[in-house]
């Protein structure tokens, strides 16, 4: 049985600093842009993989130019930075036959384990990245492509378009209000997580069979796969599923309430928790027989929420949290992002990535499981050309200069 790591072995000297993780020794070559694939490969980097971004020097990842200018470098703006820590970067013009030849040579010489892309499918042949072509170069390669709607559909897609298409917006926002997108690009992030799991499964399968794989991730299918309950309830079981704002369709009280100095979210999930809430002096007036069971609370949810609003209005947030938590009632402060970063359960596991040139430090949340890895600062455009082309292909400065003049790298 072969190892899960690639035949390329350990990451070479000078590779981004990272804690040795499960995927140490796995090399990923990623033709990536925007959010979903960069987040997927960021997750792989967090687990120890060597991730090398591939970009066209003349038309790099558009996200490099999005956000605030925090470094005085036009191709290193703020929105690009978070999802690209822990990576290396090269430039390569895959629209030129010589660029395609270099890609194939890199796959062989670096012992690339995973090639990933999130281009539209109509570009595959033009760029020379079709799965059959690259698997012919290295038969145990894992080829991953992320598209909006699958490899047989070339429609352009971005996260909010897919939130609309997948029905997310129908379920998000105030009841009676307009459809609303999430505050996070959940379709991008969800497709990245699904792609990540498929890569890890393919690496395991290859370790047992020696075979490569083609993985096609449809962002639409990824998003709809989360809609298990809404689709089953609405299409098969006769339920009307629609926007509820901060409420829950089946449980009450579940809502946001204003306090004297902020907001709290109260989520009572069963009758025992309701009894615990109404045992508190502040809420004792709500301990009426008609509210004892969840069905009764749902039947008068408007009146119930108005009464709870009165109970919370002159309570301080800290006082509300302390009393309800002590009673075993699920409740949380509605946190600002500053609150989240300061939360002791978060703060002790933040990762900090520093730019060796400017000293700028970026705080990142740690992966959900395991120790926070140490990651390098996001790479400049083509930052590792000399190292990687020299390491893998023996190309010296003069040859690289010639390739730059010809717009190949």
Stretches found by the model and what they are:
Residues 1-208, 380, 386-409:
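N-terminal helix-loop segment corresponding to the beta1-alpha1 unit
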Residues 51-54, 325-339, 395-400:
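Short, well-structured beta-strand/strand-turn elements
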Residues 58, 148-150, 219-224, 261-263, ...:
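Glycine-rich beta-alpha junction loops
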Residues 192-212, 229-236, 278-286:
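Oxidoreductase and adenylate-handling cofactor-binding alpha/beta cores
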């Amino acid at each position: 049985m072969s190892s899960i790591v690639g035949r390329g072995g350990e990451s070479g000297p000078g590779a981004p600093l990272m804690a040795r993780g499960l995927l140490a020794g796995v090399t990923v070559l990623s033709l990536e842009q925007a959010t979903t694939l960069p987040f997927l490969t960021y997750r792989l980097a967090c687990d120890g993989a060597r991730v090398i971004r591939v970009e066209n020097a003349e038309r790099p990842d558009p996200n490099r130019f999005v956000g605030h200018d925090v470094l005085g470098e036009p191709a290193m703006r703020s929105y690009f930075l978070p999802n690209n820590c822990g990576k290396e970067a090269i430039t390569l013009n895959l629209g030129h036959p010589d660029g395609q030849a270099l890609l194939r040579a890199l796959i062989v010489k670096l012992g690339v384990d995973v090639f990933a892309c999130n281009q539209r499918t109509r570009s595959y042949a033009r760029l020379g990245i079709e799965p059959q072509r690259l698997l012919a170069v290295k038969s145990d390669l894992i080829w991953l492509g992320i598209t909006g709607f699958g490899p047989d559909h070339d429609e352009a897609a971005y996260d909010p378009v897919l939130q609309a298409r997948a029905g997310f917006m129908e379920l998000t926002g105030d009841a009676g209000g307009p459809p609303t997108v999430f505050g996070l690009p959940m379709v991008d992030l969800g497709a990245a997580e699904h792609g990540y799991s498929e890569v890890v499964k393919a690496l395991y399968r290859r370790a047992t069979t020696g075979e490569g794989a083609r993985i096609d991730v449809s962002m639409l299918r990824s998003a709809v796969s989360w809609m298990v309950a809404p689709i089953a309830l609405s299409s098969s079981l006769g339920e009307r599923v629609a926007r509820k704002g901060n409420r829950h369709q089946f449980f009450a009280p579940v809502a946001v309430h204003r306090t004297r100095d902020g907001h709290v979210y109260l989520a009572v999930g069963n009758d025992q928790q309701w009894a615990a809430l109404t045992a508190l002096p502040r809420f004792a007036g709500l301990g009426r027989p008609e509210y004892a069971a969840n069905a009764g609370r749902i039947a008068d949810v408007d009146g119930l929420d108005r009464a709870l609003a009165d109970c919370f209005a002159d309570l301080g947030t800290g006082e509300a949290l302390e009393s309800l938590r002590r009673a075993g009632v699920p409740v949380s402060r509605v946190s600002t992002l500053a609150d989240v970063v300061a939360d002791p359960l978060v703060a002790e596991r933040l990762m900090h990535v520093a730019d060796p040139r400017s000293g700028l430090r970026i705080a990142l949340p740690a992966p959900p499981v395991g120790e926070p890895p140490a990651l390098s600062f996001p790479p400049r455009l083509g930052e590792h050309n000399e190292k990687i082309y020299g390491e893998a292909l023996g190309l010296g400065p003069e040859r690289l200069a010639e390739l730059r003049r010809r717009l190949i790298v």
